[in-house]
A protein has these predicted regions:
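Conserved, mostly hydrophobic/aromatic
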Residues: 114
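Active-site beta-loop-alpha junctions enriched in small/polar residues
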Residues: 81-83, 117-119
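Non-cysteine beta-strand/loop elements that form the S-adenosyl-L-methionine
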Residues: 126-136
């Protein structure tokens, strides 16, 4: 499998006019806790049901034999709303990143991409993401 797009949580700090999903919006108080708790409850089951290997075969461009293939590492794109919002980042994103690395460590590896608006990025968050092996 070359890639999977996984929406972690509906919460987003913005209300973009171009957004295709009405559930990507700001949530507050009890609503925020409910959408975060739902994502927190669901992610272990979602990860457990992902393919055992996230690899795919691609033709070897350096070979003249049509049956020569290279095994390549697939990727999972984590998105939301915005996965860098609080409390999504700490309660869902970071545990999901760690669980994905654990699941695929000995099964061909994984490239993990974090999709975000980017306006919540700080040097500290960038370091935290890189320490959890996001693909950059």
């Amino acid at each position: 499998m070359e890639s999977i797009y996984y929406v972690l949580c509906w919460h987003c700090h913005r209300r973009c006019k171009h957004c295709y999903e009405s559930r990507f919006r700001p949530y507050i108080r009890d609503e925020l806790e409910a959408v975060v708790a739902e994502a927190e409850t669901n992610f272990p089951n979602i990860i457990a049901n992902l393919p055992e290997r996230m690899t795919f075969l691609e033709e070897n461009p350096d070979s003249s034999k049509s049956e020569d293939y290279i095994e390549k590492t697939g990727k999972i794109i984590l998105s939301g709303g915005d996965v860098l919002t609080e409390p999504v980042r700490e309660r869902i994103l970071y545990p999901v990143l760690e669980a994905l690395q654990e699941k695929y460590r000995d099964n061909g590896g994984i490239k993990v991409v974090v999709q975000t608006t980017g306006d919540l990025l700080t040097p500290k968050i960038i370091d935290e993401l890189l320490s959890r092996n996001i693909w950059s």
